[in-house]
Amino acid sequence: MEISENTLSIMKNFSGINQNMLIKQGNTIRTITEARNVLATAVVDADFPQDFGIYDLNEFIGSLSLVDAPNLDFNESFVTIGDSTGRSKIKYFFSPEETLTTPSKDINMPAGEVKFVLDNETLSKIRRAASTLGHDEVLVSNNNGTLTLSVVDSQNSTSNSYAIDISGEFDANTNFNFILNITNLKIISGDYDVEISSKNISHYTNKSSPVEYWIALEPESTYKV
C-alpha cells in the first residue's frame, strides 16, 4: 500500500500531540497526549491492513522519506518500506501496544454553550500574538455581548494582551472565561467549527478535512449564568 501526502501531513501533525501511536486496521487514526488532555482523530485515504504500533512517529515518517513513492508491505511484526524501483528497502519493526499511549475510549462531548468558526487566519493571528507576547493562554470570553478571543497571562492582570472579536453563538446573558493552553492547540492548519462546553472541554472539527480534536480547558475556566 502507498501513503499519500495528505495522510503524511496528518501523521506529522499527530506526532506533535504524541510521538507514539497505535494505528488500527482501517482508515481511521487516533492519538492522545501523555497527559490525556488532547485527543485527535482523522479519517485518512489509506486503508491499513492490520493493527500496528509505532513508538517514534517522527522516525517512522522520516523513514518513509528515505525512499521515493514509498510502498508498504505489512508483516506480523514489521513493515517493509520499498521504493518505486524495488532496489531500496527499509525493514521497520512495530512496537507492542503496552509501550504506547493510546486512547482508551471515545469522548462523549457534552452540549456546548459556546459555538463559533475559527478560521485559519484568526488561528494564525492568535499563534503569532502568543509568540510575540510570550503568553501561553487563549481566553474565550463574553465581552459585553461580543465573543472575544484573547491572548493573555491570566495570572497577571497588568500584562500585555491581544484580543480579536469574532462571530459566535452563545447566551449573551452568561459570563464565561474559557482558558486554553496554546501548547495544546496543536491543530492542523484550516478552518474549524468549534464548540466549547462548561464541562471544561472543547471540540474542533476541520471544515474541509475529516479531522477532529478534543482539547481540555484549563481548570481555572469559569462559566456563570
Give the label of every model feature segment.
Residues 1-93, 112-225:
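DNA polymerase processivity clamps
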Residues 98-116:
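Long, charge-dense
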